[in-house]
Amino acid sequence: MIQVYGIPNCDTVKKARKWLEEHGVDFQFVDFKKSPPQVETISKWLEQIPLETLLNKRGTTWRKLDEQAQAAAATVDGAVKLMAEQPSIIKRPVLEKEGRFFVGFSEENYQEIFSK
């Protein structure tokens, strides 16, 4: 089963979910707010996704963090712990398909992912 991780009111997540529905793709949505990803899950994502991609330093959640919290994210372990505690700083959506992980949404990427 394809899983989409994110926050329901995020515009990018909405676009991804709409695209999947319009293309008849069955998927399960995992809401970060109701079911935050565990350290193990985030670590698994990082096996395929670079930390700089997964950790969203452009969002308001990141900017609201104090310097100490931001500094803790300089290490992989610190970043994983921070993402588990503050899932809003994870770039969204995270798509899981057949053991592969993808971050963000663009129609072109989704067309390529689902043409295989």
Regions found by a protein language model. Name each.
Residues M1-H23, Q28-F32:
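Local sequence-structure signature of Cys/Sec-based thiol-disulfide redox active-site neighborhoods
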Residues F32-K116:
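Thiol/selenol-based redox catalytic cores and closely related redox-interacting motifs
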